[in-house]
């Protein structure tokens, strides 16, 4: 039987640690940490975990930082990816994205919402658990994972497949505006290649223009995007052309190849095989003898480890009556005296591997808001850090009590 959950004390402690979480988050933001360059921020997180009293902290061969609280037989994990995207056009920022900014309510900087704020709240949730003696028949694993922005879920493929770590469920701390999120659409990265024959541009009839051959394909892709699958909860599948490439001997020549990249979002019931086949079936694709394929990812992590995978990120969701939803709803109601909003992400998370590939339930609750992700002047809310730290401290006991 789980311990009684001291919700009031947990929330008071979370409020007490607002300044510490703010400082720690700003420290992380000040360290540029794009995918495959996370070494410094990983070591900064390890330092903070050790400072607040985690029982064990280690960095795995891929470069993920793993912190443990407790020694119980049942394992629950909470995850934050700690890499960020770049800053884009610096002229679009009103403040330095790494120096950041701070007001009484806000913290600004690259990674504040997406998603180093989640890490700040998790680390101090660990301290709250230690302060209040909330350890029970569980072990809490807090992960700071790498390369998510490059290849979402690859870090957890490694953790599960190579390290043999398999929690009973995982809380994703991606931004949810302090709502409970229970699913997301999947995605895949598709490429279409068309071949042509070059010749001098003064007599184009002698060649076979690959760009012209791609034109009808683009039109049919746009039409296909209007008739993709639909799910009542996750919404519709989508398709957009995100990149276009060509080769040509010169600007005075016919292009001899053309390729496009496609960002395909998969709703419930859609498969990677079906997504490729529906493109291969397009008349313009067949007429051009185009090759339709899926991208692969094999970029080394900051430690030099290569863990290749195909660029397919499965759709996932848990049902409203799932134990993970109940555990988070009960924790939220105990802390705040009202029911949380239960919804879904628009973007993708590490859940694509944790649940999408490996069937380990995932549930989301995080500080910050989705529209802040990858945007200039990114920010998060200090109150969100407090709310999430309290939730993360209460969730393990709420889970044990829910069963």
Swiss-Prot record:
Active-site annotation: 83, 148 (proton acceptor)
Cofactor(s), names only, from the UniProt record: Zn(2+); Co(2+)
Residue positions binding Zn(2+) 1: 81, 114, 174
InterPro entries linked to this entry: ArgE/DapE_CS (IPR001261), Bact_exopeptidase_dim_dom (IPR036264), Peptidase_M20 (IPR002933), Peptidase_M20/DapE_YgeY (IPR017706), Peptidase_M20_dimer (IPR011650), Peptidase_M20A (IPR050072)
A biological process term (GO) from this entry: proteolysis
Free-text comment on the cofactor: Binds 2 Zn(2+) or Co(2+) ions per subunit.
PROSITE patterns: ARGE_DAPE_CPG2_1 (PS00758)
Residues that bind Zn(2+) 2: 114, 149, 374
UniProt KW keywords: Cobalt, Hydrolase, Metal-binding, Metalloprotease, Protease, Zinc
UniProt-listed Gene3D superfamilies: 3.30.70.360, Zn peptidases (3.40.630.10)
One term of GO molecular function: acetylornithine deacetylase activity
NCBIfam families: PRK13004.1, selenium_YgeY
Membership in a protein family: Belongs to the peptidase M20A family.
PANTHER family: ACETYLORNITHINE DEACETYLASE (PTHR43808), N-ACETYL-L-CITRULLINE DEACETYLASE (PTHR43808:SF31)
Name used for this protein in its record: Uncharacterized protein YgeY
Species the sequence originates in: Escherichia coli (strain K12)
Primary gene name: ygeY
């Amino acid at each position: 039987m789980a311990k009684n959950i001291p919700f009031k004390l947990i929330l008071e402690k979370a409020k007490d640690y607002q300044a510490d979480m703010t400082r720690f988050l700003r420290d992380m933001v000040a360290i540029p940490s794009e995918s495959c360059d996370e070494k410094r921020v990983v070591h900064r997180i390890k330092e903070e975990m050790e400072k607040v009293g985690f029982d064990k902290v280690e960095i795995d061969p891929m470069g993920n930082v793993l912190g443990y609280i407790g020694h119980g037989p049942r394992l629950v994990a909470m995850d934050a990816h700690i890499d960020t995207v770049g800053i884009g056009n610096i002229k679009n920022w009103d403040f330095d994205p790494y120096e950041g900014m701070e007001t009484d309510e806000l913290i600004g900087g690259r990674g504040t919402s997406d998603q180093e704020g989640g890490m700040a709240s998790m680390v101090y949730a660990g301290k709250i658990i230690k302060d209040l003696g909330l350890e029970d028949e569980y072990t809490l694993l807090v992960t700071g994972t790498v390369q998510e922005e490059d290849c979402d879920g690859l870090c957890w493929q490694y953790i599960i497949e190579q390290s043999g770590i398999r929690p009973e469920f995982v809380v994703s701390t991606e931004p949810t505006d302090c709502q409970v999120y229970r699913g997301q659409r999947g995605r895949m990265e598709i490429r279409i290649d068309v071949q042509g024959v070059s010749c001098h541009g003064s007599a184009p009839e002698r060649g076979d223009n690959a760009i012209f051959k791609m034109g009808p394909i683009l039109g049919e892709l746009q039409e296909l995007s209007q008739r993709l699958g639909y799910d009542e909860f996750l919404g519709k599948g989508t398709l957009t052309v995100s990149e276009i490439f060509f080769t040509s001997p010169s600007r005075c020549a016919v292009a001899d190849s053309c390729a496009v990249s496609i960002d395909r979002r998969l709703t419930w019931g859609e498969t990677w095989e079906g997504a490729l086949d529906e493109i291969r079936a397009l008349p313009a694709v067949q007429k051009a003898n185009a090759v339709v394929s899926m991208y692969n990812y094999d970029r080394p992590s900051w430690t030099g480890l290569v863990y290749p995978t195909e660029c397919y990120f499965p759709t996932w969701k848990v049902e409203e009556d799932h134990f993970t939803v109940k555990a988070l709803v009960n924790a939220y109601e105990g802390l705040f005296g009202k029911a949380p909003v239960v919804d879904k992400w628009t973007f993708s998370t590490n859940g694509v591997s944790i649940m999408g590939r490996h069937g380990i339930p995932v549930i989301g609750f995080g500080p910050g808001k989705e529209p802040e992700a990858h945007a200039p002047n990114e920010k998060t809310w200090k109150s969100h850090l407090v709310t999430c730290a309290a939730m993360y401290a209460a969730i393990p006991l709420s889970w044990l009590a829910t069963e």
